């Protein structure tokens, strides 16, 4: 039994679709959203994405990361299968780690207009160096803007606790 009306699921086309088309080039249009039924409260939604891959824009070598996406929804939420396919579309996309995290965040802001969002990539080392770009956003003029500033300043106070290596 569902509490969702069929009209609330109209934009959700990928979930349950047995003929899924896996895209190998960056494809922001694959992202889908659905209405948040709980706009009266703040709550976090967190996605752990341990199989993210992209390509180095200079060498074409693959980069691997675990990406953490956390957000406080407003009116819309991202549908998880569409997010999976969207992240998969970075497989042959050549960009620096920092660019990938900002692109992902910007696309999700455009899709959902969340109250708050953060995207953190923990990339596996290449050449003995790991890169962990963190980016966030809080809706301007709201308490979430202040929250974003606070979390930015405090997001990685204890780097020795990072254990994805």
UniProtKB/Swiss-Prot annotation:
Question: Which chemical reaction does it catalyze?
Answer: 7-aminomethyl-7-carbaguanine + 2 NADP(+) = 7-cyano-7-deazaguanine + 2 NADPH + 3 H(+)
Give the binding site residues for Mg(2+): 163, 165
Going by the entry's taxonomy, the superkingdom of the source organism is recorded as Bacteria
Extract the Pfam families matched here. QueF
- Report the co-factor binding details: Does not require a metal cofactor.
- Keywords (A to Z) from UniProt: Calcium, Cytoplasm, Magnesium, Metal-binding, NADP, Oxidoreductase, Queuosine biosynthesis
Where it sits in the cell: the answer is: Cytoplasm
Activity regulation details: Activity is strongly inhibited by Cu(2+) and Fe(3+).
Q: A GO molecular-function term, please?
A: metal ion binding
Q: GO biological process annotations for this chain's record?
A: queuosine biosynthetic process; tRNA modification
In terms of InterPro entries, this protein maps to: GTP-CH-I_C/QueF (IPR043133), NADPH_dep_7-cyano-7-deazaG_red (IPR050084), QueF (IPR029500), QueF_type1 (IPR016856)
Name the predominant localization: cytoplasm
Alphabetical GO CC annotations of the entry are: cytosol
Q: How does activity depend on pH?
A: Optimum pH is 7.5.
Active site, UniProt feature: 56, 63
Query: How is the subunit organization of this protein annotated in UniProt?
Result: Forms an asymmetric tunnel-fold homodecamer of two head-to-head facing pentamers, harboring 10 active sites at the intersubunit interfaces.
What the protein does? Catalyzes the NADPH-dependent reduction of 7-cyano-7-deazaguanine (preQ0) to 7-aminomethyl-7-deazaguanine (preQ1), a late step in the queuosine pathway.
What name has this protein been given in UniProt? NADPH-dependent 7-cyano-7-deazaguanine reductase
The scientific name of the source species is Bacillus subtilis (strain 168)
